[in-house]
């Protein structure tokens, strides 16, 4: 990048070295990083929309079902485990906070609303990113560096249709279902710690849920998790698909770094988009 | 000459500051086997990737049947590329799919064929490539040779008109290398596709190639027949062909045709004017039957054993030999006249009927099932003088061949 300020014939060499360039170095770095970000964002958006246009085609349904099994069904155990303890901890913490105000009767609504509106979508998305997202990036990355994706091109099989589109659609279907499981098991966890262990009345716990949880809260939770599903699946597929174009590494190392980037970036984007979506929905 | 199937005009490709191909011009003709040779990293695979559209040139144009690909409509490009198939150097098999599923993939994804028809076609290819036992195994469970054959089967499953082979024999032992080349040649004749190979297997690849393209210093420096390449006077010959030939006589242990010519030339210069020499011409008849019945490996085993034996027998008395064609070997006996050569051949045949027949028979008759088959070994001798044309002497020796051995293969032998 050249920084030519003298249009009257200043030498280019003056701008390449010297203290001037040193001062501009941080700006250059920030500028390049921002350009790279915008570039990648644009590319990932095109990637997503191109993949979505390939959703409907022959034999796609079978691949989508296969991916739902892989992303969704195989994640149920870990989701249930995490959600049970999340609900139990939430019940335990909330109970001790509510007791101070004599409001332990609101435990059910507090636990359920926290889970449905916030913790359920976010933790589900993060857990799936860790379990299935990383695997998706590694799988596509290895297929890329071992020329399997090039092989698909040569066989006239569209790689986006064959590899990416089913994963994105499966994520959009699986994430809300898993969130529903997370919410339900989390509420049961809250029930165990609040009612079974701490002695809150069972009827009060359940009634509080029925009274304060609105259908709109549930829908908002699902809207959030669908946004997360699109983000996570796109980021993970994109990172794997373009693992060979990384400037910082090559081969197996590039796949490893792509997987790390996919998980970190997905988690950050989940939290950022959580704030944005929440502010729009409230 | 008719319009080339594929033509490069001044194609240049750069990666950053590095120019890999510079103003490359080449022609590939329909129905032929064209082999691109050159040093590792010279950009041979890149030419194949340009042909199949995985990479676009920075400058220049690629023509398909006389039409520039850059000027074609999307549907025309799709139709053109649909005729092609590509066998990757690293096989590019899907490691999460079995061999059967890998081979079936193009049919499942790009055709509307019924399951039964796909199964029939896939099983036929699996049998042709001798992968029946490996059909339901994963690529990681196969040997390198089996993976190559699986990749070959997948490349041929759609009956393509043009098949690109990127170093199909890399990482294989000499027998397997020649078996794969022989398989490609056989399929090319059978299905009449245009084959474009990238290979290091000099001189073995000459036996199956109609045309050779030599890539050297970022450009195509030679296009022509393997015979024309033998007379090609260019640094490419010294730097590339000589170094590769030195490594490539592993199968038969014999000299390459070019080395044979050089030896012959040296001998002729040393010998006095009018001095005699003899050419012995050997051929293995019904080698194709061996290939059909017992596979390419068995055929290459026979050739290897035959070559090793000829080299051992005649090398000890100053003779030198080369493989002339897939099933033809020639030996030169310098300073020997016809009667001496006949006596040497008599000894050779005697030994041959003893120990050697059993060795070759064992190689040829591996896993005999079904009907018995025979392999005939012929030999012919012709005498030449230092002043005479060696090609004419070879032709004379070929025309005078007689049977010197017959191997009988039958179940239980």
Predicted regions and their residues:
Chain A
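Active-site cofactor/substrate anionic-group-binding motifs, chiefly glycine-
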Residues: 67, 71-123
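Membrane-interfacial helix-loop-helix connectors in multipass membrane proteins
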Residues: 93-116, 185-226, 230, 234-254, ...
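Selective transmembrane-helix segments that form parts of the transport pathway or gating/packing helices
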Residues: 72, 76, 80, 119, ...
């Amino acid at each position: 990048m050249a920084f030519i300020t003298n249009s009257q014939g200043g030498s280019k060499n003056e701008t390449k070295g010297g203290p001037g360039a040193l001062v501009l170095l941080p700006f250059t770095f920030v500028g390049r990083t921002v350009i790279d970000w915008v570039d990648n964002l644009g590319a990932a958006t095109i990637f997503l929309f191109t993949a979505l246009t390939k959703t409907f085609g022959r034999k796609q349904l079978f691949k989508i079902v296969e991916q739902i099994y892989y992303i969704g069904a195989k994640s149920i155990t870990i989701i249930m485990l995490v959600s049970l303890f999340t609900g139990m901890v939430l019940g335990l913490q909330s109970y001790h906070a509510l007791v101070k105000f004599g409001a332990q009767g609101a435990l059910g609504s507090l636990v359920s609303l926290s889970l449905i509106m916030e913790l359920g979508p976010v933790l589900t998305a993060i857990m799936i990113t860790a379990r299935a997202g990383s695997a998706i990036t590694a799988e596509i990355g290895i297929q890329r560096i071992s020329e399997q994706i090039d092989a698909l091109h040569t066989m006239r099989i569209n790689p986006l249709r064959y590899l990416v589109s089913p994963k994105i659609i499966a994520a959009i279907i699986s994430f809300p279902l898993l969130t529903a499981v997370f919410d339900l098991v989390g509420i049961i966890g809250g029930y165990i710690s609040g009612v079974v262990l701490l002695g809150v009345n069972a009827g009060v716990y359940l009634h509080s849920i029925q009274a304060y949880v609105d259908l709109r809260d549930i829908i908002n939770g699902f809207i959030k998790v669908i946004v997360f599903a699109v983000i996570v699946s796109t980021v993970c597929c994109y990172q794997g698909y373009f693992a060979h174009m990384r400037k910082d590494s090559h081969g197996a190392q590039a796949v490893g770094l792509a997987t790390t980037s996919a998980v970190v970036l997905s988690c950050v984007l989940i939290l950022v988009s959580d704030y944005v979506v929440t502010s729009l929905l409230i | 000459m008719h319009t080339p199937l594929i033509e490069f005009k001044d194609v240049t490709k750069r990666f950053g500051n590095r120019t890999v191909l510079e103003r490359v011009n080449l022609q590939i003709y329909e129905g032929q086997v064209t082999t691109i040779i050159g040093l590792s990293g010279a950009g041979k695979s890149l030419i194949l990737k340009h042909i199949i559209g995985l990479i676009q040139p920075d400058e220049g144009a690629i023509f398909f049947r006389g039409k520039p690909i850059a000027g074609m409509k999307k549907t025309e490009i799709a139709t053109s590329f649909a005729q092609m198939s590509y066998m990757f150097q690293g096989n590019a098999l899907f490691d999460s799919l079995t061999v059967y599923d890998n081979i079936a993939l193009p049919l499942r994804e790009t055709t509307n064929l019924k399951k039964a028809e796909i199964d029939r076609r896939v099983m036929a290819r699996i049998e042709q490539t001798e992968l029946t036992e490996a059909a339901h195994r994963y690529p990681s469970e196969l040997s390198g040779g089996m993976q190559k054959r699986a990749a070959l089967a997948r490349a041929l499953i759609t009956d393509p008109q043009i098949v690109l082979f990127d170093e199909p024999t890399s990482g294989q032992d000499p027998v397997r290398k020649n078996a794969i080349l022989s398989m490609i040649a056989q399929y090319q004749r059978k299905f009449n596709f245009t084959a474009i190979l990238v290979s290091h297997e000099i001189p073995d690849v000459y036996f199956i190639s109609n045309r050779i393209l030599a890539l050297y210093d970022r450009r195509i420096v030679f296009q022509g027949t393997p015979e024309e390449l033998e007379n090609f006077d260019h640094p490419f010959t010294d730097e590339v062909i000589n170094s590769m030939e030195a490594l490539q006589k592993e199968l038969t242990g014999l000299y390459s045709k070019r080395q044979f010519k050089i030896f012959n030339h040296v001998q002729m210069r040393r010998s006095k004017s009018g001095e005699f020499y003899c050419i012995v011409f050997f051929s293995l008849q019904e080698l194709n039957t061996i290939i059909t019945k017992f596979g390419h490996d068995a055929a290459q085993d026979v050739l290897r054993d035959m070559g090793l034996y000829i080299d051992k027998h005649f090398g000890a008395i100053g003779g030198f030999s080369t493989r002339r064609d897939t099933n033809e070997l020639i030996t030169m006996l310098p300073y020997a006249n016809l009667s001496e050569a006949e006596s040497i051949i008599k000894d050779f045949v005697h030994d041959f009927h003893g120990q050697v027949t059993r060795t070759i028979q064992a190689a040829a008759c591996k896993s005999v099932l079904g009907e018995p088959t025979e392999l005939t070994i012929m030999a012919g001798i012709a005498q030449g003088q230092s002043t005479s044309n060696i090609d004419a002497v070879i032709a004379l020796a070929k025309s005078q061949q007689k049977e010197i051995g017959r191997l009988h293969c039958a179940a239980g032998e």
